Amino acid sequence: GEVLEESIDAGIDWIHLDVMDGNWVVNETITFGPAVVQSVRERVGPNIFVDCHLMITNAERTWKQYADAGVDLIIAHIEAIDDPATLISEIRESGTMVGLVLNPDTESNAILPYLSELDLVLVMSVVPGKGGQSFMPEVEGKVRTFRAAIDEQISDGGRKTKLMIDGGIKAHNASMVASWGVDVAVIGSGLINDRASIAENISEIRSK
């Protein structure tokens, strides 16, 4: 709760929640479920954008619990779902925004066919769920592929899909990924650490 309040006081207006079920991620990590997500929503209020990154095996059966918990956007792993088109349609019909995410070793073609229906594409720059990893710069080509496809889609009058990157983003590489064309960078330990306050870390990142 204190971290949430400090983040909001520092100017954070988008909160990214990682949901892991202990099965799909490589290190068997379990984080939290819909009840905690709902408590986050209630704590931060309606003006903070909240997304939910589902690193789970059964997103197609459980996503509605997270929509009902009040998230603005649900992001599901393309590698963990059987019928992306149906899932996208169902989430959208619920009134919740929808995104797809892909792992560093998954080709962009896995998501590109669904791009026109997505509010967001998330490119992982570390392996999901495995702590202590370094940023993987080799995802640059994938990020730029999505940037070009989204720009073309927008120029044709299509959906203004956001492009997000997640994994190992800190002050020293934030400007680099921005130059690749990402709209949103997920920052965890680069923001919340013992080295400085959240506000100080934000200031450092923005100054790069």
Task: Please report, for each region that a protein language model flagged, where it lies by residue.
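Conserved N-terminal beta1-alpha1 strand-loop-helix module at the mouth
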Residues: 1-73, 81, 93, 97-98, ...
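Short secondary-structure boundary segments
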Residues: 19, 78, 102-104, 125-126, ...
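Alpha-helical scaffolding within the catalytic cores
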Residues: 106-109
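Active-site phosphate-binding strand-loop segment of PLP-dependent enzymes
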Residues: 128-133
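Intrinsically disordered, low-complexity Ser/Thr- and acidic-rich flexible linkers and loops
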Residues: 151-158
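Acidic, divalent-metal-coordinating active-site segment for phosphoryl/phosphodiester hydrolysis
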Residues: 168-180
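Acidic, Mg2+-coordinating phosphoryl-transfer loop and its flanking beta/alpha structural elements
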Residues: 181-187, 193
